[in-house]
């Protein structure tokens, strides 16, 4: 069951489109894109979340990421 969000789908899609646009404009390979996005997530957690909550947030994020990855053969 998907979780509801306090953010509108339009807001999320607009930000996603902008981020993808930056990566595409720079012709960023997949491995570098993942590295940069991972560093961004780490930075957000380390600078915006209290130390006591960081591990829990990171675990929740990792779980959500794993749950959203498709396992079909297409790429």
Swiss-Prot record:
Membrane spanning residue stretches: none
Coiled coil: none
One Pfam family of this chain: DUF1414
InterPro entries in the record: UPF0352 (IPR009857), YejL_sf (IPR023202)
Gene3D superfamilies: YejL-like
Family recorded in the similarity comment: Belongs to the UPF0352 family.
NCBIfam families with a match to the protein in the record: PRK13689.1
The protein, known as: UPF0352 protein plu2871
């Amino acid at each position: 069951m998907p979780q509801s969000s306090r953010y509108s789908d339009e807001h999320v899609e607009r930000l996603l489109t902008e981020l993808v646009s930056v990566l595409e404009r720079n012709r960023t390979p997949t491995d570098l894109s993942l590295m940069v996005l991972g560093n961004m997530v780490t930075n957000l957690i380390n600078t915006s979340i209290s130390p006591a909550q960081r591990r829990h947030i990171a675990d929740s994020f990792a779980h959500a990421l794993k749950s959203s990855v498709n396992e079909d053969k297409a790429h």
